[in-house]
Swiss-Prot record:
Residues 129-178 are annotated as: Tudor-like domain 2. Belongs to the SPIN/STSY family. It holds the Pfam family Spin-Ssty. Exhibits H3K4me3-binding activity. Residues 50-99 are annotated as: Tudor-like domain 1. It comes from the Eukaryota. It comes from Pongo abelii (Sumatran orangutan). Signal peptide: none annotated. This is Spindlin-3. GO terms for biological process: gamete generation. Residues 1-23 are annotated as: Disordered. The record marks D169, Q176, D180 as: Histone H3K4me3 and H3R8me2a binding.
Amino acid sequence: MKTPFGKAAAGQRSRTGAGHGSVSVTMIKRKAAHKKHRSRPTSQPRRNIVGCRIQHGWKDGDEPLTQWKGTVLDQVPVNPSLYLIKYDGFDCVYGLELHRDERVSSLEVLPNRVASSRISDTHLAEIMVGKAVEHIFETEEGSKNEWRGMVLAQAPVMNTWFYITYEKDPVLYMYQLLDDYKDGDLRILQDSNDSPLAEREPGEVIDSLVGKQVEYAKDDGSKRTGMVIHQVEAKPSVYFIKFDDDFHIYVYDLVKTS
C-alpha cells in the first residue's frame, strides 16, 4: 500500500526496524525554523478545524500531484500552525502546517465533523494506556510478527483508536487496539516498570520539555533539529518530537543532556 507523500510508514511500513525508544538529545536555543520547504505568509486567524474531515492535494518538487483525505486530530499548542492528521488507509499520524505549507494545495474542510463513538470497554482502555504490549501483525505471506511497543494514549477525536509506538520503529501510530486485544493480536506485558507512578519519588515533579528545540545526532554523525510538541501523560519521560525535515511524529523517552 502506498504511504502518504512518498514516505514509508508502519502497518504500511515494512517493519524492518529502525531506531529505538530512548535517546539523548541536546536542548538548543530557540531559533528560526530551518526552511525545508516554502511556506505561505501568515494570514488572519482561521476557523478551528480539529475534528474535521479534510482533503487536499500534495505536490513535492517534480513529483506528480496526489490527493489525500483524512481527519484532523489536534492542533499543536506550542506551534498552532502544526496539525496532527490521520489519513484514510494509513496508520501513521502526520504533522503538517496545513495552511502554510505550499506543498499542500486546494485544502477543503468537509462539511461533517467526526462523530464521537462509544468505547466498548472503558476499563480495558484505562488499563491498556501506558503499558508495554506485544502487537501481532500478519505479513503478506501469512506469517505473523510480534512487535513490542507501548500504548501511549487514547487518540483525540477518533476515540476508539489509540496512540502507540514501537521499540524498533519509534514513530507515532494509531490503531483500534481494543479490537486487536479481543482478537488475540495484542498482549499486555506484565512488567512492574510499566507503571508511571513507579518512575517518580513521592512529590517529585518532572519538568516538561514541551516547546523546547532539540538537536538529534544520528548514527552517521549528521544532525537533525526539531521541537518537542507533546508530553505523554501516562509516561511523563516520553515525548512527541516533530523534526524540521520530516512530517512523521517521533516518540522518544528523552534523556536531557547539557
